[in-house]
């Protein structure tokens, strides 16, 4: 490719509404242009990267035995009604009516359609296993689209769905997809972790996220440096304490804490460590009777140590909270506790309030908590003496650095990540709700065991940039760079020798199957170099009259601090030796 025949449209400054590095650099480098909130056009150089990502994904999916198809972007409500997700999906699913007033949606995912295909086409166990995948546009009407392609409304995704005869076979399909994902992210050249994860709204009981490591990542990843343990912080278990609870050493006292409504403020006022305080969080569940009519509200008091944070995913697994919960209103809190948030505690609480203590709190003695009276806290609080043991003890908190690893092989560390892939074992969640069955060898109908596997193709671009950039621009991994090599002739319009040598190298690299661009725009060197550093091409060769006099050219990798002088006779071979394999 010659730059004069290509479309290069770089900007000196990013638009003022660009938030994160990847968004700013993709706009400045001419990869994307904003059309509406969360919706972008991909310019030729951006689409070039997308196609390279898609090629790697498609290659590994095919290698793993998956079969590509395409399902409709527009899907009828009837299929989604079968699983109950027409209502469950909420406002993120964009719904509309056609001219006949029939309900449709722009699909955010395709479990319903692919399950419908399976129940119509896969009649016998002899046709199993099957794994169907597509690479297609999706739409999710995010409440607040942000971070460019990282959290857009329209995006490209690879979604795959496996169908198996039993749990064991489904496990093999899951493992095959997990291995394929590892190969995909290895080939993409990204630093990543596969972490155990919560299954969320999709359901199922086995799940892993593939997280690209980046300081700007939205997700917290918990891992053990001394082992293979890794999990999303939503799932990572805080182990029960081995030490037994200490005996009470203090008397219970009601202590004035005027205007101190947080554990941090109380600890500072009293001159005590934050970890001696207990935080009270009030949740509520809306009860219904057998006819699904409202039947009152149950209030729950969840207790975590003052220096810990509540993990809402873990809270949602408590019996009684699994069907859904919300934070209690101030009115509900006042009715049960007699005061407002900031001074709440478990001592003397109405028996109708269910008390759930985090494992750490259940092991505490002489702790500080709210007195259920404005401007007062209790010190020297002890279980069994000052209040009954909690109704339930559970793992309620987020992991913190230094907690013991659940696999017993060291202490946990935390890093940030960007989720770019997710694999789920679904079981029969969808096949049962849609009555999707096949006949086994005895002629009896059985529900398919299913898995689903997603990769955010366009999200990978943003994640790769968040992980790989510097002050000058993007630093693409070789495998997905828009061009792997750029040849920069200095004095293209003035020197026959420069044009000859630059063209010769360009044609040699092209003949070797190397993805190279020749910058024949006759720009000033500073402009030319700045453009390609911003765009992020990993390898640059500069050919100019000064070097040609000595029979030399300059090579510089995008991460290199300085250029190296290479003899012209060795130049093509040298550049080839620097390129990472992409297959």
Curated annotation (Swiss-Prot):
* UniProt keyword Nucleotide-binding, yes or no: yes
Q: What is its main location?
A: cytoplasm
Q: Does the keyword Cytoplasm apply?
A: yes
E.C. number(s) listed in UniProt: 6.1.1.15
Q: Which CDD domains match?
A: ProRS-INS, ProRS_anticodon_short, ProRS_core_prok
Q: Where in the cell is it found?
A: Cytoplasm
Under catalytic activity, the entry for this protein gives: tRNA(Pro) + L-proline + ATP = L-prolyl-tRNA(Pro) + AMP + diphosphate
Cellular component, GO, one term? cytosol
Question: Which UniProt key words apply to this protein?
Answer: Aminoacyl-tRNA synthetase, ATP-binding, Cytoplasm, Ligase, Nucleotide-binding, Protein biosynthesis
| HAMAP family in the record | Pro_tRNA_synth_type1
Q: What does this protein do?
A: Catalyzes the attachment of proline to tRNA(Pro) in a two-step reaction: proline is first activated by ATP to form Pro-AMP and then transferred to the acceptor end of tRNA(Pro). As ProRS can inadvertently accommodate and process non-cognate amino acids such as alanine and cysteine, to avoid such errors it has two additional distinct editing activities against alanine. One activity is designated as 'pretransfer' editing and involves the tRNA(Pro)-independent hydrolysis of activated Ala-AMP.
- Anything noted about its domains? Consists of three domains: the N-terminal catalytic domain, the editing domain and the C-terminal anticodon-binding domain.
Subunit structure, as described in the record: Homodimer.
Q: Which family does it belong to?
A: Belongs to the class-II aminoacyl-tRNA synthetase family. ProS type 1 subfamily.
Identification of the protein by name: Proline--tRNA ligase
Which source organism? Aromatoleum aromaticum (strain DSM 19018 / LMG 30748 / EbN1) (Azoarcus sp. (strain EbN1))
Organism taxonomic ancestry = Bacteria, Pseudomonadati, Pseudomonadota, Betaproteobacteria, Rhodocyclales
